[in-house]
């Protein structure tokens, strides 16, 4: 069973911590992950630094810039996760942008995720209609594709996302009124 599915098998609240790989220095990722877990993190997202992180806010954009200046690479991130896996079974997801995965090749990326025991992959810029094969290939390796929905996502699209996603769907909240939660929570399928 995928560790993400196992984690979310209970209804308790979960603490998911995001860490940009290679920030504040190239070799700090492992220590930051292990300290986050000691501090109570139930799951870790490791951000893959990218030169144009348009879906991220200014803090993560700056962390990406520093990590890239530090010289972190996707291959090094996989090696760091392998080292982390020697010390913990906490679920780990990679979060990034599709361009570095395309450059590596999707099959090679998925193989490296599997080899490093990555549990999930989040790619906010991968268009849903272009993600079917990629998501299915992830699921074939027991890796959860983690897809996103927003308050303005249509019912039809939510159903498509829930069928394609793995064991977790991200609900992006917009700062609107009435409560963003009320705008979409009632529309989410009870099980994906």
Feature roles, as predicted:
Residues 1-16:
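N-terminal amphipathic alpha-helix/helix-capping segment at the start of soluble metabolic enzymes
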Residues 16-27, 93-104, 148-152:
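Active-site mouth loops of central-metabolism enzymes
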Residues 45-72:
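Glycine-rich, proline-tolerant flexible connector loops at the mouths of alpha/beta enzymes
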Residues 47, 113, 161:
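Conserved, mostly hydrophobic/aromatic
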Residues 64-122:
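Active-site beta->alpha loop and helix N-cap motifs at the rims of alpha/beta catalytic domains
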Residues 119-130, 144-151:
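Catalytic beta/alpha-barrel core
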Residues 151-168:
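Anionic-ligand binding region
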Residues 175-180:
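Conserved small/polar residues in nucleotide/adenosyl-binding loops
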């Amino acid at each position: 069973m995928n560790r993400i599915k196992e984690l979310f098998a209970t209804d308790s609240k979960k603490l998911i911590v995001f860490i940009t790989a290679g920030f504040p220095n190239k070799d700090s990722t492992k220590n930051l992950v292990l300290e986050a877990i000691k501090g109570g993190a139930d799951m870790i997202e490791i951000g893959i630094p990218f030169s144009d992180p348009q879906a991220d806010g200014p803090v993560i954009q700056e962390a990406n810039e520093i990590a890239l200046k530090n010289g972190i690479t996707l291959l090094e991130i996989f090696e760091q996760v392998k080292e982390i896996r020697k010390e913990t079974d906490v679920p780990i997801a990679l979060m990034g942008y599709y361009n570095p995965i395309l450059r590596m090749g999707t099959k090679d990326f998925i193989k490296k995720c599997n080899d490093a025991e990555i549990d999930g992959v989040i790619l906010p810029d991968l268009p849903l209609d272009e993600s079917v094969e990629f998501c299915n290939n992830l699921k074939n390796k027991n890796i959860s594709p983690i897809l996103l929905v927003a308050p303005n996502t249509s019912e039809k699209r939510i159903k498509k996302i829930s069928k394609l996603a793995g064991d977790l769907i991200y609900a992006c909240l917009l700062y609107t009124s009435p409560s963003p939660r009320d705008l979409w929570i009632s529309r989410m399928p009870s099980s994906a």
